[in-house]
């Protein structure tokens, strides 16, 4: 938790902001800022709507995982079901329910909010909202046309 004195010592203040790239997933900005010592510098960062991540707990105590090729990494990775918020004001729990069903075909009768994670705060505004899903029922997936993944 921050206090006012610490905020005065550490806060960087925006002087100007420029959108340098606008995409379907994220927007990139370049801001001119004033440092706590009064000097100015630049910051480049990504504005992101946010995301959700779901630990879908099966009856045997294991969790559902996905395997998919992640282009930036150029390899197949194992992940928990997750997805982005469609809009900045989308309710995270609704996004979590949607993403779990679309990607895995799983619906859950019980949802527990686990907290938020900020994975890359040095250069992104993305916040990942974490949920535990229990009481699972398995059905058909509804993947986006550009999604290819395996679920176990």
PLM-predicted stretches and their roles:
Residues 1-10:
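Basic/polar N-terminal segments that are highly enriched at the extreme N-terminus
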Residues 107-114:
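A short coil-to-beta-strand element that immediately follows conserved catalytic motifs
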Residues 29-37, 120-140, 152:
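Active-site-adjacent beta-strand/loop module that shapes the phosphate/pyrophosphate-binding cleft
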Residues 9, 43, 53-98, 147:
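Conserved Nudix-box catalytic region and its N-terminal flanking loop in Nudix hydrolases
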Residues 103:
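Short alpha-helical functional segments enriched in proximate histidine and acidic residues
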Residues 49-51, 145-152:
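NUDIX/MutT-family hydrolases
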Residues 12, 16-53, 59:
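Acidic, metal-coordinating catalytic segment for phosphate/diphosphate chemistry
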Residues 16-19, 116-120:
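Short, solvent-exposed loop/turn elements at beta->coil junctions and helix N-caps
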